[in-house]
Structure formats: structure tokens, C-alpha cells
Amino acid sequence: MAAPVPWACCAVLAAAAAVVYAQRHSPQEAPHVQYERLGSDVTLPCGTANWDAAVTWRVNGTDLAPDLLNGSQLVLHGLELGHSGLYACFHRDSWHLRHQVLLHVGLPPREPVLSCRSNTYPKGFYCSWHLPTPTYIPNTFNVTVLHGSKIMVCEKDPALKNRCHIRYMHLFSTIKYKVSISVSNALGHNATAITFDEFTIVKPDPPENVVARPVPSNPRRLEVTWQTPSTWPDPESFPLKFFLRYRPLILDQWQHVELSDGTAHTITDAYAGKEYIIQVAAKDNEIGTWSDWSVAAHATPWTEEPRHLTTEAQAAETTTSTTSSLAPPPTTKICDPGELGSGGGPSAPFLVSVPITLALAAAAATASSLLI
């Protein structure tokens, strides 16, 4: 009858664990959201618990050291970004959740950087902004555009959250534009503004599809072509001029050419056989500033291909030499018996002709082996 006791103990422990789990994981009120400045000190109270209440603190599910507590309060010194998280205070015995704080560590915003530019003149312009340093917490921006005393609409860019677009209402206006921007977050607020004339912010996008090619039979020429930026809406009414720069990769110094019109140029002073880098910029003929440089194009001037080493004269000379080496040696004349003098006898011509015949046979065999 003693066997059921351990089972009863296990059942009690399991029930207790279930109660604790339910208390620690049961639905609770939304945590209190709190923002604190980077580097500061913060004290987090355990809700309405007494100062001397026995509590345990956790952050993101991990127990915190008891030496961080001042009574039931949690004290954090020199806040760092890593201190951000969900802090929870539990009753030490029952593990009943007393309080939760969602802590965000960050900075107040510094003065924003604001700029405006017209790359679609004369349609309109856009303004963009950013903070010089991150705040690590959410920021809210508010933009106001004035043309004289008239408020203009600044349409949000669908792709870039820190940009908006304004349409020109009156071209060639002498009235200045004023753009103001304010930024705020849970830790502070800041603002800035700029004022400008319409023509001062005109700046096209860089030229597109820059291509450089060698010129056949011209070792010092490169032909460069490009296209007007696709964002420039009316190049006929508002023509662009171009600025071309180029240099060989072996040198650091650029050479420059300014072109009043056209979308092509031939470089005539390139170094033969050296790879070049070429870029082009654009500007309205009358107003505004130069665009940024285009994507770089690379090209090497034309070079003559090396000729074959064997020329026609060398081929003829080689053929003659080969033919001569294969010809048999001159035939040795067989002496007449009468020319041999006395004592030669009838066998003399036979004795003389044997070495000659052998020599001819050897020469023929040599020639045959060479031809094979």
C-alpha cells in the first residue's frame, strides 16, 4: 500500500507546476512602454508592489541578478542599446506576474539634413531628408513647403520614405521657395528649414548608356556615345550640355572635354594599347548645376594584329632548299677501257662502275626515306 504515495507526490508537483506555468503565461495586460536615453540611469518600479516586497525580475525571459534590485525596484545604470527589452516583475513565491515594462533605449533627434533638387525640370522638384545620427527609436517627420505665402502639396514618394515631390505651379518665378521640416520622437524634437530660388536646384541625373568603342585602324582614337537621362522630360525645349572626362588606367590625371550639344564624342589623343575609363556628366544649358558622373565605360584603342612569321619569300626559299637537299649527287663518268691504259683488261669498266652504282642506290634510298 506504500506504492501509491510517490504517485500522489508526483501528481501534486505536476499540479503545482501547472499552476505556476499558468500564472506566468496567462494573458496579462499590455506592458507599459517606456523610452530612456542612451547612457542614462533608470529605476523600474514593480508596479504597485511595496518597496520591500519579495520579487524577482526577468528580461526577455532571463532572470536578472539580485544585486540589480533596490528593494522591489530594478535599477539600471549607464543604459546601452542592449538594455532594450521586455522587463517583467514576479512575486518571488507565487511567481505571480506583478508588472511588465517594454523598455526602449535611444536618443533624441539632432537637426535633420534637408536638401531639394529638380531632376525633372520643368515638371517639379523633390526634397529629401535624413538625420545625421541614428536615434534607435521611431521618429516622426513633418514637411511644409511654401512658395511665397502659398502652401504647396508635398506628395510622399512611394518607394523612399524620406522623400516627397512638389510640382512647379509657375515657371520662371522669382518668388523663393521655403521648405521646413520638423522631427520628433519620444525623447525630443528638432527642426530646420531652407530657402532657395527655382533655378538654383536644377540638377539632371547622370547620362545613361555610356559606351566607348575603338575606331578601326586608328590606334589613338575612341568613339564615345551616351544618352540623355530618361528622367529629363523635355530635352528639346530644355537642352542639356555635357562634360566628358577620360584617362588611361595607368594614370590618375583626368582629361576633360565640354560639349555644348550632341551625345557623341571621339577621343583623338588616347595612348595606343592602353585601357581607358570614360565618364560623362550633364547640365541644363542655362541654369542649375552639373549632374553626378555617369557609370564608367571602359575601352582600349584599336591595335594591329600581329602578322604570321612565314612570309612568301621565306616560303619560296624554304621550298628551294628542300628540293636541293633531296636531289641525288652528280653521276660519275665511267671511264672508257681505252682511257685506263695498259693492264686494265676487260674487267676494268666493271670494277669502276660498281662504286658508282652503289652511290646512286644509296642516294635514292636517302631521298625516299626523306619523302616518306
Curated annotation (Swiss-Prot):
Residues where lipid is bound covalently (GPI-anchor amidated serine): S342
An example molecular function term from Gene Ontology annotations: interleukin-11 binding
Residues of the Fibronectin type-III domain: 108-205, 206-306
Positions of disulphide bridges: C46-C89
InterPro entries on file: FN3_dom, FN3_sf, Hematopoietin_rcpt_L_F3_CS, Ig-like_dom, Ig-like_dom_sf, Ig-like_fold, Ig_sub, Ig_sub2
Domain of life: Eukaryota
Pro-sequence residue ranges: 343-372
Biased composition annotated in UniProt, kind: Low complexity: 311-326
Signal sequence residues: 1-22
Membrane topology field: Lipid-anchor; GPI-anchor
Any Gene Ontology CC annotation: CNTFR-CLCF1 complex
Location of the region described as Disordered in the Swiss-Prot/TrEMBL record: 301-340
Major place of residence: membrane
Family as reported in the entry's similarity comment: Belongs to the type I cytokine receptor family. Type 3 subfamily.
Job of this protein: Binds to CNTF. The alpha subunit provides the receptor specificity. Receptor for heterodimeric neurotropic cytokine composed of CLCF1/CLC and CRLF1/CLF-1. Acts as a receptor for the neuroprotective peptide humanin as part of a complex with IL6ST/GP130 and IL27RA/WSX1.
Subunit and interaction comment: Forms a heterotrimer with LIFR and IL6ST. Interacts with heterodimeric neurotropic cytokine composed of CLCF1/CLC and CRLF1/CLF-1. Either alone or in complex with the heterodimer CLCF1-CRLF1 interacts with SORL1; this interaction may promote internalization and lysosomal degradation. Component of a receptor complex composed of IL6ST/GP130, IL27RA/WSX1 and CNTFR which interacts with the neuroprotective peptide humanin.
Protein name, as recorded: Ciliary neurotrophic factor receptor subunit alpha
Species per Swiss-Prot/TrEMBL record: Homo sapiens
The gene coding this protein: CNTFR
